[in-house]
């Protein structure tokens, strides 16, 4: 699926899966592992380059596409639903921090995490 078709599905509130999100990103973009911080203050999570690559790809893609917080969370598919089903849990910390801090909490340590193929 092209990234434009995928974004149209997302913006029309059709459910998307994590697998479809990553597949769409991989089809359209060249990925460079990049470290990033998610969150603010003591709650910030530092993700080293090459770790949590799904989250890194999704946040970079959403940023390029200028998606809002809710649209970005939807890209995580069932993982986002897992967090909603367990609001006091500790799994999927990148999703939890993004729910709390939004785009203000995302900081990439490098540029060009994703480039069009």
Language model features with spans:
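Long, compositionally biased
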Residues: 90-117
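Short coil/turn segments at secondary-structure boundaries
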Residues: 37-41, 112
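Amphipathic protein-protein interaction modules
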Residues: 42-93
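Short acidic/histidine-centered micro-motifs embedded in hydrophobic/aromatic stretches
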Residues: 24, 28, 75-79, 98-101
């Amino acid at each position: 699926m092209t990234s434009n078709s995928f974004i149209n599905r997302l913006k029309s509130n059709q459910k998307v899966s994590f697998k479809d999100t990553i597949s769409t990103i991989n089809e359209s973009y060249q990925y460079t592992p990049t470290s990033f911080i998610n969150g603010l203050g003591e709650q910030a999570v530092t993700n080293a380059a090459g770790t949590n690559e799904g989250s890194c790809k999704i946040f970079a893609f959403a940023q390029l596409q200028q998606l809002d917080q809710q649209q970005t969370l939807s890209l995580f598919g069932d993982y986002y639903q897992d967090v909603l089903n367990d609001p006091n849990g500790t799994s999927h910390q990148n999703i939890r921090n993004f729910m709390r801090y939004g785009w203000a909490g995302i900081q990439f340590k490098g540029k060009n995490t994703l480039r069009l193929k």
